[in-house]
């Protein structure tokens, strides 16, 4: 379970790092 959780967390982090920057910049500039 721990290994699975680590793999899942790594995948989620990688996906977030890939997806968030452009969306975060757009949302940040749009809201702020």
Curated annotation (Swiss-Prot):
GO terms for biological process: amino acid biosynthetic process; branched-chain amino acid biosynthetic process; transcriptional attenuation. Disulfide bonds: none annotated. Keywords: Amino-acid biosynthesis, Branched-chain amino acid biosynthesis, Leader peptide. It comes from the Bacteria. NCBIfam families: PRK10424.1. This is ilv operon leader peptide. It comes from Escherichia coli (strain K12). The lineage of its organism: Bacteria, Pseudomonadati, Pseudomonadota, Gammaproteobacteria, Enterobacterales.
